[in-house]
Amino acid sequence: RSGGESPTAKSASGLYRSGDGGANWTEVTAASNKGFPEKPFGRIAVTVAPSNSNIVYAFVESTDSALFRSDDGGKTWDKRDKSQLMVWRPFYFASLIVDPKNPERLFKPDLGLIQSLDGGKSFANVGGGTHGDSHVVWIDPGDTQHVYVGDDGGLWQSFDGGNKWWKQNNLPVSQFYHVSLDGADPFHVYGGLQDNACWVGDSAYPGGIANAQWENMCGGDGFFMFADPADQDYIYAETQGGAIIRVNRHTHEARDIQPRAGYNEKLRWNWNTPLELSPNEKGTLYMGAQFLFRTRDHGQSWDRISPDLTTNDPQKQKQEESGGVTVDN
């Protein structure tokens, strides 16, 4: 929980415990609850084992982020795991799911999906074959080897506790950041997907449009994507951090055409960098870092056509002093 808007405001996050069904609450602290960490805290994930309500797990973002376990309903705590698998981006990946029948088995969605079979002492990746960035897990209470995981790639299920995974391909859950069309008849659709690359597909196809009619043109997080109006075999596809390629749709030959920094200079790109294609001037694109760039030769070269359009305030570029307990990667 935020302690205020100021970068110097202290976090107001905390863990609270009730012994009377929620009528009254007492904060869990390092001073009164042995083994619990010292403040300040960021995000906290807490869950109670369904088969034993005395067993509580808490993943605490702090200056020493770690997983903690209590065997007495939150009165005392034991630090369990603080490996890189556990603590990576704790402000973002912070949920715990305990097996309904086995309190020693729990999952934590993370960059992948990790699982512990020893009460949180150690974790191993069980998300092999799924997409990255897991967010939610459901364990079948009738058959705890049957598990669903939701991630940036969609929904997956396993029938053997996570050894093998099957994707549910009939769910239209992909998120487009941007789409564009070309001048073909019927026209093609171009778009970048959140954490699922850049794609081009048909707007109409005999028998209907299936997954096979979509072609992958780049990896990463897909953002802006355009077909060259003068030669629609060539596509401009952008991914995170201002990375942009010119790719031949038929040969898939690709070339990096991102504008380069000058000597002893650093360009500052947004995660989703603005990109625009001129509909009137052949081979002309515009792209924005702190400067506006223009190319008139399909990305072979770029001209800087503006001064720094940002405040370039160093005080606003310091993650370590942003008020967060941990910083982003």
What is each residue range found by the language model?
Residues 1-329:
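Beta-propeller blade termini and top-face loops
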